[in-house]
Amino acid sequence: MAKFDPRNLPDLVRRPILTEKATIMMEQDKYTFEVTPKATKPQIRAAIEDLFQVKVVKVNTALPPRRKKRVGKFIGFKPQYKKAIVTIAPGDVEKIRQVLFPEV
């Protein structure tokens, strides 16, 4: 992903991460997403701004350690993923909540 191609931006963000910690961080306008491991912060910022039509203030990334997975006598690892914590501008919070959590 060396080139900055706007057509590839939607493929960078895989899914939102909805854990207890991520839910608490949503109250501080911080949203957590799983992204491709090779995605950079500027690419993540552009993808979130393009997908949700919001202003991104800050992007923090983390590569959590791989977890062991055992099947019988064989030991393997779960796939590597990258976590992006995106801070949204206070005025745009309702836009992203409507997309992530539509009312039924």
Curated annotation (Swiss-Prot):
Coiled coil: none annotated. Signal peptide: none annotated. GO terms for molecular function: rRNA binding; structural constituent of ribosome. Keywords: Ribonucleoprotein, Ribosomal protein, RNA-binding, rRNA-binding. SUPFAM superfamilies: Ribosomal proteins S24e, L23 and L15e. GO terms for cellular component: ribonucleoprotein complex; ribosome. Disulfide bonds: none annotated. InterPro entries: Nucleotide-bd_a/b_plait_sf, Ribosomal_uL23-like, Ribosomal_uL23/eL15/eS24_sf. GO terms for biological process: translation. Pfam families: Ribosomal_L23. Belongs to the universal ribosomal protein uL23 family. Part of the 50S ribosomal subunit. Contacts protein L29, and trigger factor when it is bound to the ribosome. One of the early assembly proteins it binds 23S rRNA. One of the proteins that surrounds the polypeptide exit tunnel on the outside of the ribosome. Forms the main docking site for trigger factor binding to the ribosome. This is Large ribosomal subunit protein uL23. It comes from Trichormus variabilis (strain ATCC 29413 / PCC 7937) (Anabaena variabilis). The lineage of its organism: Bacteria, Bacillati, Cyanobacteriota, Cyanophyceae, Nostocales.
